[in-house]
Amino acid sequence: MASDGRVERIASSIRAIPNFPKPGILFQDITTLLLDPQAFRDTTDLFVERYKDKDITVVAGVEARGFIFGPPIALAIGAKFVPIRKPKKLPGEVISEEYSLEYGTDKIEMHVGAVQPNDRVLIVDDLIATGGTLCAAAKLIERVGAKVVECACVIELPELKGRDKLGDMPVFVLVQADESV
């Protein structure tokens, strides 16, 4: 990782909010990162530097905050951007993948044909916690025959062991955060 101060600037620009959205949670708020143009640029630059020579053809952003970081990365590396959304948000034909939550299940979707079998895909989200959403996104991509090159997140909550759920899928994160209040 770059030792030029960018990661430290990014980490210091992320606000931790205790007891949000419920008691006992320390919420990692990236909106303060977005308010700092240099930290925001550093974030996208670090991802671009990592992926510019990896022949990525698709950057898939996971709703909602993957939509913030994914498009500038896609533009900079010459890849298309594909949104992976919550159910019933995309018009037209979609494919979906269900995944488990702490209580119950949820689902994510993408347009049929948005990702092709020969595509090399980077999945982008703001944070990896339990790994459920990223795992579902990877399954969705792999179901159409494409290759997930890596999952890229700004923040990781290592205590929640999200990488374990992803198995041997490569994951790259900029900031390790503490989840305890």
Curated annotation (Swiss-Prot):
InterPro entries, per database record: Ade_phspho_trans, Adenine_PRTase, PRibTrfase_dom, PRTase-like
Listed GO MF terms: adenine phosphoribosyltransferase activity
Superkingdom field? Eukaryota
Q: Which reactions fall under this protein's catalytic activity?
A: AMP + diphosphate = 5-phospho-alpha-D-ribose 1-diphosphate + adenine
Which terms does the UniProt entry file under GO BP? Answer: adenine salvage; AMP salvage; purine ribonucleoside salvage
Gene3D superfamilies in the record, alphabetically?
A: 3.40.50.2020
Give the main EC class.
Answer: transferase
Listed SUPFAM superfamilies: PRTase-like
> Which PROSITE patterns does the protein's record reference?
PUR_PYR_PR_TRANSFER
Q: Where in the cell is it found?
A: Cytoplasm
**Broad class of where this protein is predominantly found:** cytoplasm
Assigned EC number: 2.4.2.7
Kindly tell me the pathway this chain contributes to. Purine metabolism; AMP biosynthesis via salvage pathway; AMP from adenine: step 1/1
Q: Which Pfam family is an annotated match for this chain, by its short name?
A: Pribosyltran
Task: Give the UniProt entry's GO cellular component terms.
Answer: cytosol
Q: What does the protein in this record do?
A: Catalyzes a salvage reaction resulting in the formation of AMP, that is energically less costly than de novo synthesis.
Q: PANTHER family from the xrefs?
A: ADENINE PHOSPHORIBOSYLTRANSFERASE, ADENINE PHOSPHORIBOSYLTRANSFERASE 1, CHLOROPLASTIC
Quote the NCBIfam families the UniProt record gives: apt (TIGR01090), PRK02304.1-3 (NF002634), PRK02304.1-5 (NF002636)
SUBUNIT field: Homodimer.
Family designation: Belongs to the purine/pyrimidine phosphoribosyltransferase family.
Q: What is this protein called?
A: Adenine phosphoribosyltransferase 1
Which source organism?
A: Triticum aestivum (Wheat)
